A protein has these predicted regions:
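Covalent nucleotidyltransferase
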Residues: 25-154
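Short, surface-exposed recognition loops or helix-turn segments adjacent to catalytic cores
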Residues: 156-160
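Charged, flexible boundary elements
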Residues: 1-24, 30
């Protein structure tokens, strides 16, 4: 899957030209960008994991965050067949580095740091599998139809 953002070499004029081109073709979908940590939620074989984007150089495995978020119980109960959601773990009005500061902690410390306005949330922006159905070959216009269903199944005010 490819998600697009402007190259850092684009100046304001070049960005506007690209936006105008996309608007004139009607070949675009947009969504709110949240500054957090990209991650995937995976339900498979009766288990649920919330994984990082990259493999750790230290452990050689993907980071797992499901024990570091307050919405973990809602995640565990949401699906019983293969489902994979792509999204961003974020802090309301926070930045990526602030999210990372919490997620790099051990689970107990990560949970204790989430107080007041420092509570980690999750924004779903894509769905690759839903209840055993692969959506990998489906266009984004079809996959995004599953986002409200997924958020409803998770049933947590911290996930949208």
């Amino acid at each position: 899957m490819k998600y697009y953002s402007f190259s850092s070499t684009f100046n304001a004029q070049k960005k506007q030209e690209k936006i105008d081109l996309l608007l004139n073709t009607n070949q675009y979908i947009y969504s709110l960008k949240t500054d957090g940590n990209w991650s995937r939620m995976i339900w498979q074989d009766g288990e649920m994991i919330l994984q990082s984007r990259t493999v750790s150089k230290k452990t050689g495995t993907y980071g797992e965050f499901q024990d570091k978020v307050l919405f973990a119980d809602a995640l565990r109960e949401a699906f019983h067949d293969t489902t994979m959601l792509i999204g961003e773990i974020y802090l309301e009005d926070g930045r990526d580095k602030d999210v990372g500061t919490i997620l790099r902690c051990l689970p107990d410390k990560a949970l204790s740091r989430q107080k007041g306005d420092k509570i980690l949330k999750y924004r779903i922006f894509d769905c690759w599998y839903y209840n055993g159905v692969s959506l990998l070959e489906a266009p984004i216009t079809e996959r995004i139809k599953y986002l409200p269903l997924a958020a409803k199944a998770i049933n947590s005010e911290l996930v949208n």
